[in-house]
């Protein structure tokens, strides 16, 4: 029943966003708007993804690996794996867990510009206990952060509710809805944050490497209609 209600909540938000019409600024690139559910990670290798690490001399294969149908990231050195393509107007789904200890990580959406640590993007936080927070990076902006208030701490916009994460070692689910200049995030089906009037409306999607061992699975993108 809880899983069913979570799906209903996400569907309701998507339906509302589809009724919102706003102007979308482009940068000359043609982002992909998904027409069907697409697995972004094929479960076998990193086809369709590019790895970037702060230490250019580091071996990416020692940071990112595939085992037992999972993506495993050591968290060191800092960096990310990102999609080769840009995307717009989608629901992004990823599942993650901390197999050893609690740590820091995140999903970057609307990533653009040069590969660096950290690139222009909006981070949807995965830091233990804080999944659902937003962080603005390298000039990107959302209205909720720009206006300030009790939820804003530096570049961070704190999530709306208490943590909805599962205990350490268990799998969590992130659903990130991007529609025009809105970004809406659900953690295990619980609505945790809403960003509006985002300065960027498309870009690449990144999974961070940021200090602790983390595992990912079931990474896909879906259309909003």
Where are the model-predicted features located?
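Bacterial N-terminal signal peptides that target proteins for export
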Residues: 1-11
